[in-house]
Amino acid sequence: MTDSTIRIAIVGAGGRMGRQLIQAVTQMEGVVLGAAIERKGSTLVGSDAGELAGVGLLNVIVGDDLSQLTDNFDVLIDFTRPEGTLEHLAICRQHRKAMVIGTTGFDEAGKAAISEAAADIGIVFAANFSVGVNVVLKLLEKAAKVMGDYTDIEIIEAHHRHKVDAPSGTALAMGEAIADAMGRSLKDCAVYSREGYTGERKPGTIGFATVRAGDIVGEHTAMFADIGERVEITHKATSRMTFANGAVKSAIWLGKHDNGLFDMRDVLNLNEL
């Protein structure tokens, strides 16, 4: 890719996040909407993507076959579901198109496929594209190094009723940031459910609690609790535009990288702090 205007494709264009992404593209300099894709059979196929997102006519018609639109974009932004994202990944890898992936819920095989594809194309893969959340992840690393060994750590997350995976990708990223800072593996210390007689809390574990209700955009709290005091680090999102803007900024940043696997900490240069 060059430093000229970057053409963006958005899959799931008719969804809540897809419409926000279209709005973000139209509001940001250096990018244009090149393609918009919906699932086959969707009544939205054939409509104008701009009118769909409420930003006026863009003369970009919603299609249903990504493989037929690869000449129209440089970077694909994907906030769909794992099985669909992996199909899109294969197409992008074949045609050397970069990707911004905000899909969550991948298993280990899916994550490995993304890592392998990054040998050929540039990919920004993050559980959360909010600037605030990624600053929180950095704060959690610092807190875990100071307090992690002697406090009880709990992560509580809340999302809208339509979210299909739990815990959220952001909650897991918070757990991984804490565990990594303490030299542990999250899979060895995570506790995802408690029910019935559980006995006392085991030292060194990281607990997770999930809420699904109403239209909550996203709330995450990491708690470091000791006897007599506790520290809570919280992020609350009130609009999906914060995620959409971060994803589009990632696409612009990715224009300077032909290949490699990155996350928002790379985009925001947080790894230097």
UniProtKB/Swiss-Prot annotation:
GO CC field: cytosol
Catalytic activity from the UniProt record: (S)-2,3,4,5-tetrahydrodipicolinate + NAD(+) + H2O = (2S,4S)-4-hydroxy-2,3,4,5-tetrahydrodipicolinate + NADH + H(+); (S)-2,3,4,5-tetrahydrodipicolinate + NADP(+) + H2O = (2S,4S)-4-hydroxy-2,3,4,5-tetrahydrodipicolinate + NADPH + H(+)
Keyword Amino-acid biosynthesis: yes
Residues that bind NADP(+): R39
Location of the active site: H159 (proton donor/acceptor), K163 (proton donor)
GO terms of molecular function: 4-hydroxy-tetrahydrodipicolinate reductase; NAD binding; NADP binding; oxidoreductase activity, acting on CH or CH2 groups, NAD or NADP as acceptor
Its job: Catalyzes the conversion of 4-hydroxy-tetrahydrodipicolinate (HTPA) to tetrahydrodipicolinate.
Protein name: 4-hydroxy-tetrahydrodipicolinate reductase
The organism of origin for this protein: Yersinia pseudotuberculosis serotype O:3 (strain YPIII)
Source organism phylogeny: Bacteria, Pseudomonadati, Pseudomonadota, Gammaproteobacteria, Enterobacterales
Protein's gene: dapB
